[in-house]
Amino acid sequence: MKAYKGMLLTCDAAVKQLILSLDERNRFIIMDLDETHLLISPDRIDWLRAELEVELEKNTYTLEP
């Protein structure tokens, strides 16, 4: 039995795929638990929030005149 220190992240499948792609550049996922849960390094949570905000903003449609 092993114990891991981490934060449980719950997300939908689309956001999880985005997080997995971010993990390829900067390893922070400790364990991929199932299709909607990840265990991530607690010291990377603020970085992940900022990166997700940037990536999700890129995928947001806006009406520009």
Swiss-Prot record:
CC annotations in GO: transcription factor TFIIH core complex; transcription factor TFIIH holo complex
Keyword field: DNA damage, DNA repair, Nucleus, Transcription, Transcription regulation
Keyword Secreted: no
Gene Ontology BP term (one): nucleotide-excision repair, preincision complex assembly
Cysteine pairings via disulfide bonds: none
Annotated compartments: Nucleus
Keyword DNA damage: yes
SUPFAM superfamilies: TFB5-like
Family statement: Belongs to the TFB5 family.
Subunit structure: Component of the 7-subunit TFIIH core complex composed of XPB/SSL2, XPD/RAD3, SSL1, TFB1, TFB2, TFB4 and TFB5, which is active in NER. The core complex associates with the 3-subunit CTD-kinase module TFIIK composed of CCL1, KIN28 and TFB3 to form the 10-subunit holoenzyme (holo-TFIIH) active in transcription.
Function recorded in the entry: Component of the general transcription and DNA repair factor IIH (TFIIH) core complex, which is involved in general and transcription-coupled nucleotide excision repair (NER) of damaged DNA and, when complexed to TFIIK, in RNA transcription by RNA polymerase II. In NER, TFIIH acts by opening DNA around the lesion to allow the excision of the damaged oligonucleotide and its replacement by a new DNA fragment. In transcription, TFIIH has an essential role in transcription initiation.
Protein name per its UniProtKB record: General transcription and DNA repair factor IIH subunit TFB5
Species of the source: Mycosarcoma maydis (Corn smut fungus)
